[in-house]
Amino acid sequence: MYKDLLPIGSVVKLLETERFVMIVGRIVVPEGVDTIYDYVGCIYPEGISSSDDMVFFNRDSIEMLVFVGLQDVQELTYRSEVLDELGELAVVDGEIVPVVDDEEVDTSI
């Protein structure tokens, strides 16, 4: 299992499926759901033809890393400045917010 968040464009094989999934987004909450997923992806090589094609999953669902997406300066900066500083997350009123000491953070600041 990959410990850090994979870059967009990475291709993985999920547990209990023979299909590959390409990562197209990270740290996502599907509309109408109070669950945060590490990733949203699409079936490879077909891609996205409608919103029904989106696959939401977490790191622990990854069986095998097939391809690592682009890791340039922008990706590394994004990961270090944004993703690494997020810590634990929660969904509050439909928005992703950081959790400090198991309490939701006030996002009105």
Predicted segments with their positions:
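Short, well-ordered loop/turn sites that connect or cap secondary structure elements
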Residues: 4-6
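Short beta-strand-centered aromatic/proline hotspots
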Residues: 19-29
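Canonical SH2 domain fold
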Residues: 25, 39-44
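Short, solvent-exposed secondary-structure boundary/capping segments
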Residues: 29-39
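Intrinsically disordered, low-complexity, charged/polar segments
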Residues: 42-109
